[in-house]
Amino acid sequence: MLILSLLLSLSSPVHAAFPAPEKSTAPITIVFPAENSVLGPADAAWLIGNVSEPKGLFKINGETITVHPDGAWLAWVPVAPGTFTFSATLSVGTSFYAYQRVVDVLPPQAPLPAKPVAFDNDSLTPRADLELRPGDWLLTRAKVSPGAKPEFRLGRKGAWQPMREVVPALGIYEGAYLLRTEDETTGAPVQFRAQGHGGAAATAPGKVTVTRATPLVGVLRGQNVVMVRTGPGEGDLFPAIGGTRFVVGGRQGNELKLLLSNGQTGWIDGKTVEMLLPGAHPPRAETETVGVRSGERESTVRVGLGDRVPFIVEENEDLTAVTVRLHYTYLHTNWIVYPDNEDFVDEVRLKQETSDIVAMTVKLKPGKHLWGYWAGFEGNALKLELRKPPRLAKKGSPLSGVRVFLDPGHMPSAPGAIGPLGTKEMDINLAIAREAEALLKADGAVPILSRKDEKDEVSLVDRPKLAVEKKADVFVSVHNNFLPGSSNPFRGGPHGYSIFYYHPHSLELARAVYEGYHKRVPLSSEELRFGDYLVLRNPAMPAILTESAYLTYPEQEAMLLEEPFRKKLAAAIVDGLRAYFKDLRDQEKRR
């Protein structure tokens, strides 16, 4: 540790010294899992920690565990359901030390006993109250004793419906019923029954309302962006902006079902929506005059609508056009006005794509490509800002003058992953970002950090906002990785670096930085990846997220604690940025 401390003390003088982890002085330390943790159903679990004497004989539950020279260790230990104790021992000469860590291991899923016939009440769906309409499907699920042949019905007088076994080994069944007009009801239970050995009955916790009433109108509260999803708790469909109005045609618990145009549906957190009184006009927009305005950093397309309606923005494959699909909208545009000095937008086209969806496609001028965009409302008009690539220095470093937003992931209230020696991910991330900051400054770039020191608290939502406020050209979020709790750390590799992107206009930046890692970082590649991370969803600029190494592994934690390795990671990021902007500059020269 003395050598390591000396290395850390020699860090760059332009920054505060890297905060080395405070290694425990106890003979045995278990960093993860924490005392009384609940571990998922498994036959083994991994642990990390450290010992005070690396050359001692270290065991957990009688199995010898390999210890890294700095005292860190990683173990994969068999477990059993229920309260489980990890008993760790360390033998050093004539000295003997012992330490215990108690956890709760959930039992594996198993079928119910055949007798007496019973339902697993925790398996019954719907779990939450539902509001449905005729033509919707009522979907049910139940776990029941083997061979019981369960059925379900809506209400106490509904017809019994069959269920189909989908997981025979566990006795899990699913059922579906297409609701009809005559099923109209309020707060009806979903009941289950099963045959054999005395039979069994049960009722799902969620009640069902089936209504033919006119759908209500909801408006998104505030000015924040809220994600509309494909289903309750499912993937992203599109972001919606405060003031947007929707037709609401159902509910599942706290989630509202949105009836969009052309038969499409979406789901949104009900707490974010204000429901209007019955009789409120449904959302309806008509496209008015379209105006194009040229700016230094972006060109803006503005179209009057008369209402705030949902819209979905889509970039084309080669980033030469953007299409906005406006729901609940009807084409009524007579004029499209282009300024004399417009050098980015070539043409705007509108068409009635379906009966109530207008597609507005903005084509860029030949040789131009999209850098990023931002779409929002100005009153009841849609304002689409199309960002231009930054102007690059014609000579010297291609990074000269480029504004790079470096986002060291996590913060004191959410420190992220932790290593066997107690290394906090937030500290490593900041140290790498500081090294990248120094390299970028030396290359003439303008680095901007979301967190400048170890005490800074910057929320996840505020980080991309801050990048826009600071007029950044690119966004780089710096992270390190941690294994899922159920993974065997000694199988399923490789375990190394990975680079993530979200929007198509971020892909080339991700590729360039990935290549920088491939050339400089002596770890395995986990390849280039799409990642649905909040900080990457902001479409205003190319944005990527780096996962440099795994704090879980003692070898990789030790590497991250060494300044030369952190410099390599920073250099990989900057190499990628430099190559990306050099390619951009070369493309501009060829035009």
Give residue spans per PLM region:
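Bacterial N-terminal signal peptides
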Residues: 1-11
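Short linear recognition/processing motifs and adjacent strand/loop elements at protein termini
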Residues: 17-24, 66-405, 412, 438, ...
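A short beta-strand segment in extracellular, disulfide-stabilized domains
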Residues: 44-50, 139-141
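Soluble non-cytosolic domains of exported or imported proteins
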Residues: 234, 240, 423-431, 454-461, ...
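Active-site histidine-acidic residue metal-binding/catalytic motifs
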Residues: 385-466, 470-474, 484-487, 493-495, ...
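Solvent-exposed loop/turn segments at secondary-structure junctions
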Residues: 410-413, 453-457, 480-485, 504-507, ...
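Active-site-adjacent mobile loop/cap segments within catalytic or ligand-binding domains
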Residues: 474, 484-485, 498-500, 527-591
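Active-site-adjacent substrate-binding region
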Residues: 504-529, 539
